[in-house]
């Protein structure tokens, strides 16, 4: 092999190692990848209109259709960019996955936004989680009360995202099966 061939091979290998694949594969796009996500601007606009009218929005679609990517790279950046003009651009997004303990997981997701929560000793964090979980379970307005307490004194909008919402149905079936046994 000549020196020229080696040089070309080294150049090609170095070029390949610097290539960046803009597609995340099967995982959803993250907020930091918004610049790679495009083509659903019309859907983002429609979602913002529906959210501003009803304060609730369900994003439905088949598994793998891009619901999470749409949320993280379409809707959330639009909200933070002030596209829902009456609400402003000051938003915090609390993301929770139901898993096997939906209320407890939601409480944990909410507490991430409580000032100084992470500085508390483990025992005090557990007490806080128990209190928030109890308030969430206490009434249909439990979530509203918890968010008011977390945001006390702040002028901030809160978007609560329940990602993988369908897990709630699996959880309720599992809970029903366990109570039958």
Where are these regions (language model features)?
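Amphipathic helix/helix-loop-helix segment enriched in hydrophobic residues with interspersed Lys/Arg
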Residues: 1-181
